[in-house]
UniProtKB/Swiss-Prot annotation:
Role played: Catalyzes the formation of N(7)-methylguanine at position 46 (m7G46) in tRNA.
Source lineage: Bacteria, Pseudomonadati, Pseudomonadota, Betaproteobacteria, Burkholderiales
Gene that encodes the chain: trmB
Pathway(s) the chain acts in: tRNA modification; N(7)-methylguanine-tRNA biosynthesis
Catalytic activity of the protein: guanosine(46) in tRNA + S-adenosyl-L-methionine = N(7)-methylguanosine(46) in tRNA + S-adenosyl-L-homocysteine
Leading EC class: transferase
Protein's name according to its UniProt entry: tRNA (guanine-N(7)-)-methyltransferase
Amino acid sequence: MLPQDPSTEPTPADDAAPVDSAGQASAPSPADPEGVAHPRRIRSFVRRAGRTSTGQQRAIDEVGPRMMVPYAPQPLDWEATFGRKAPSILEIGFGMGETTAHIAGLRPQDNFLGCEVHEPGVGALLKLIDERGLANVRILQHDAVEVIAHMLTDDCLDGVHIYFPDPWHKKRHNKRRLVQPPLVKVLAARLKPGGYIHCATDWEEYAHQMLEVLSGEPLLENTSTAADGFAERPDYRPVTKFERRGVRLGHGVWDVVFRKRAA
């Protein structure tokens, strides 16, 4: 097991920065629903300049070779990747990985594939995987939209987690938001019948956009019976430190859970 070290917090993205400096793809455009990489695509994230700590780098070097999956534009062999056949959950943008590790620990029967471009976050989750002995998590350090388009096949996923994606709160930046109809259409195709998409955000206007976009996908149905359409927080999703702080300040958090209709 790797030695402990303080976690490095991610540096918030500068919302004035228009693109990811690495030039990776992001949310697919309506003209390109399969998310094929294109250098002029509007991006839903920027690469943050957070420092990778010594412990995180050690985890990348020592744990990464076992737990990281290289990007390749060909279908992922889930059974070979995880060494077993099990329900498959995709997490898009896991941040520093605490929620991913928590859920994976609660649900050892499921396989979790996390996509994250931020290197300190990758290192932080690899440390947690090592410290907690998690065998059911793999990491792809690549733009999730390209992974979904080129590595995932239809009817391969049992669930998708999208927690606290960048809200791009300035109106002129709303088009950069991850949860948009073209991406949801592809995710719905990748889900098995009965599979779910679970989104969470602390930005109310984005929460309503998520609800509207998911409601507009014919393959999906809302699991909530509440009048406003939002779901109670599922027991498996932990309340993060950031979330607790927001609640103390009077901020809300909204969960949206949709399921793919039976074939």
